[in-house]
Amino acid sequence: VSSAASDVYKRQVQTIYQSFCKVGSFGDSSFAGFANYKKMFADPEVWQSLLNTFKYAIIEVPFSIAIALILAVFLNRKMHGRTIYRAIFFLPMVVAPAAVAMVWRWLYNSQFGLLNHILGTKIEWISNPKIAWISVAIIGVWSIIGYNMVLFLAGLQEIPKDYYEAADIDGASGVRAFFKITLPLLSPTVFFVLVTRVIGALQVFDLVYMVMDISNPALKKTESIVYLFYQYSFQNGNKGYGSAIVVLLLAVIMVLTVFQMIGQKKWVHYN
């Protein structure tokens, strides 16, 4: 574990150092000072990709958590086929990202896609710049629900049944019991899922890379900050500038995580 942690820190330091350098495709570098950061802060593409990433996270995080929590509450009850339902909802997590992208590209196809066939429309789900980012976020929600649900199920099974029996005696059941008992006792799990999903959503890459073509007119409205890093570092060979973009993302994640850690004191109950 310590070896793995040291490798992570080493790579972080190396990335930060590279952000101050002009790095070539073959690893040769020369110190460039704050040139990469000056360029980055003046680059509208960086801010557009950061905005795209925030928009994606605003949809993916709350919806994936809310839907997963509702499913977990229902699947935590005694019901026929409970194990099968759990497996079905968790399935997207174990499916290869390439297969997920292929299925959703077919669903979203404006000419012969299933969604347009059902709706009887010709909506350009992933090529219309106004709605493409929403379409990509929907895939993200669908893909992560199963993972969130499993975590919530684990948390629900740790809640003693005595609380619910006492609530029944007092006449508090159903929705009232959920908000008075389930949610407060599950708040540490909800907080963990929230923090990890915010970090995960801000690092979205594979969905954009596999669903959106380079020639797609909506690409600039959907490309994430990590996708932009990939473009500069690996496609354009500008690893110094790519490292500066990653440092920006790291700073954003750290700030948001600190705010979440401060805010959790008001609503997370550990006792």
Residue ranges, per PLM feature:
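A structural signal for multi-pass alpha-helical bundles of membrane permease subunits
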Residues: 3-271
